[in-house]
Amino acid sequence: MKQSQPVLTIVVPCFNEEEVFQETSHQLTEVVDDLIEEKLIAEDSKILFVDDGSKDRTWALIAMESIRNKKVTGLKLACNVGHQKALLAGLHKAKNRSDCVISIDADLQDDISVIRDFMLKYHEGCEIVYGVRRSRKTDTFFKRTTALGFYRLMNKLGIKLIYNHADFRLMNKRSLEELERYPEANLFLRGIVPMIGFKSAEVLYDRKERFAGKTKYPLKKMLSFAFNGITSFSVAPIRFFTLLGFVLFFLSAVAGIGAFIQKLLGHTNAGWASLIISIWFLGGLQLMGIGIIGEYIGTIFSEVKRRPKYAIDIDLYNEQLSPLQRQEKERLEKKYS
């Protein structure tokens, strides 16, 4: 059991979350207050909201809340970079001022009451704690089925994932330092974090309905996320098409020998239907194979450019404000104090 009280930062990526922000901030503040009262975390623990280039009033709400509530702070990214990179920005920022960091989405679907269980596991010596959904009853049939298929496929491809785990997890400082050593531009944290190793534990919870607003992960984003996960961690799809190519070559050779023998025996068939079907079949396979190779080439292209993953516009966490931003904060403080 750890004796000292660790500094905890809860990192919450946000994109157009004005409908749910106030409730999320309120509930997380209550959790932090309870943990401080139980002496499970230090009094200077924080809730860090990361605004991922929102188009609504999300950042204004974060800035105002940081004035009213000293446990709340914010990080504003210069533009929308996506959930994974926004989350990584928060983790990087929180690492230097925290003993442990918990990441959670802003929609309140993850059960915040188990954050206490996360901290108990941390005090027992766990360096990474995964929040695992007990069931997916709140998901639609389509999402539940596709998610199950995705996890099974990833396991078949040899990719180590925590089943029914998203990005609700605790990481201590040492594991966050290890995470910084992974330079991937195409982030798939659900695959990267288990690779770090270290002592870990799982905490089960029941996933709730979204408190308000609409999901920020439509089908298009989910498919892109899945493809990114596969191409970032496995070359099995390319090997599959290589093997399929050898099999089709063998079958075509057998068919060619058979046709030659029939020709020698004087048996000839027009075979237009079979010819057209085989051409379309092989053409489709070739296009699929080219598409998969293209995905890998695109992934390589993104990686070799080594572009920064995000740019920070305003950092309330470290008070790195320009004179104009400082004036705006002072104006808000006068207005809401």
Curated annotation (Swiss-Prot):
A GO term for molecular function: glycosyltransferase activity
Gene (name only): ykoT
Predominant location: membrane
Keywords from the UniProt entry: Cell membrane, Glycosyltransferase, Membrane, Transferase, Transmembrane, Transmembrane helix
Topological relation to the membrane, as annotated: Multi-pass membrane protein
Protein name, per record: Uncharacterized glycosyltransferase YkoT
GO CC terms in record: plasma membrane
Organism of origin: Bacillus subtilis (strain 168)
Protein family (similarity comment): Belongs to the glycosyltransferase 2 family.
E.C. no: 2.4.-.-
UniProt KW Membrane keyword: yes
Compartment(s) where it occurs, according to its Swiss-Prot or TrEMBL record: Cell membrane
Entry superkingdom: Bacteria
EC class (word): transferase
Segments crossing the lipid bilayer: 241-261, 273-293
